[in-house]
Each structure stands twice: as C-alpha cells, then as structure tokens.
Amino acid sequence: PHAIWLLCAPSAQDVLPTIRSRTRIVNLAVPSNQAVAKFLESQGFEPNIAARAARLSEGHIGIASLYAKDERVMTDRDELIVGVLGLHRASDAVLLAGNLIDNAKAQAEAEVNVKASEAEADFRRINGLGPKDRIPPKLRGAYNAIAKKDELKRRATRLTRDVLDRALNSAASIYRDVAVLQNNAEDAVGLINLENRSAITELSVRLDRTGAVRRLEDIATARRRLNGNG
C-alpha cells in the first residue's frame, strides 16, 4: 500500500526547507466565477442559477453548490444583505443579530437531522436491512450512535458556527463592494451583490473609505472570535 501526505500552508515559504525539499509544491488558486459556474452546470444546474451561486460564493465551490441546490439558503442570504443595508440604529443591529442566530440554529439542526436520517438509511442498506427491519443486537450500538443526542448537539453547534461564519462573510461582501465602487474598480473585479447595486452605491457615497475598511476589519475580528469559540 502507498500513502500520499498533503501538507497545506499559506505559501511554500511557510514550510521548513528540510520538508519543502522533499515535497512537490502545488500552488492552488481561488477558482473564477466562470469556472465555478461551469462546474455547477456540469452537475445539472441551470446556467442562470449556476452563475449567481458562483458569484455569491466568491470562489467557494462548496458554498456555491449549497446556494444552487437550496433555495432557502439563498433566500436567507438575500434577506441578510437587505437587512445589513437597512441598518440605521443599534437596535436594528441587535434585532438582525438575534434573527441571524435563530436562523443559523434552525438551519443547523435541520441539516444535522437530515444527515442523521441519511446515515441511518445507509447503515441499514450496507447491512442488508430494510427500512422497517429490526436492528440486530450486535449492530444496535453502532446504529444508535448515529443519532445519539449528544453527538447531534455537538454537530449542530459546529454547523451553527459555520452558518454564522458564512453570514459574516456575506456581510463583509457588502463593504467589499462599497470599496470597489469607491476605488472605481468595478470593471476590474466586479461586484458580488449585483442585486443590491443601488443600495450599495448609496452606501458608498455616505460612507468614506476609512469607514468601509474599518467595517471589514470589524467583521474579520468577529469571524476570528467566532472560530475561536471551540
């Protein structure tokens, strides 16, 4: 048997020379919107859905696939962008944050339960059992572990953080678009939130460049703290 070790680092210079000299370096890049859209189309999604999911995912194939196949997740993102653009008071932010957390928990719990049901069905199929067959005593422990309450709670907590992190990244995309407009760089890099172009254009006039950068930094700090919550 053979094994392949994949060592991941921000750059080759971040790897010790003694290790780097014994490896083959493969430089990865964020795929373009066109490449992601083409991949989604190859999976059977309509071109318009694939193109929008690719643009909103910012090169993340996993998130693009999620947007393309789950209309509810895409709708939640749309509502979040509108909500952030509509913030005027601190109380607005508190309400939006509360709704965001509630939606993240609900989405995480639903997805965890679906995956648990799929895992149970796979377990039955692999072991030659039908949907209504009794689980043999020797397999019962492994079967019950699939939907163990503590394990499901742990998975839901982790997935909730993933959903919140994705939401924070979506919020950051607003101020990224603001910075793009302020620097007249739309032709070079394009906008992510094209559907909200009018509101983002207005925000780019009201908010100075320093304010846009500060908000991006604040969101980045929130993401780091969220990821550090274990």
Annotate each predicted stretch with a short phrase:
Residues R176:
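TRNA-recognition modules of translation machinery and tRNA-sensing kinases, especially anticodon-binding
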Residues H2, P10-A167, N183-A188, I192-G230:
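Charged, glycine-rich active-site and insertion segments that engage polyanionic ligands
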Residues A171:
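Conserved phosphate-interacting/catalytic interface
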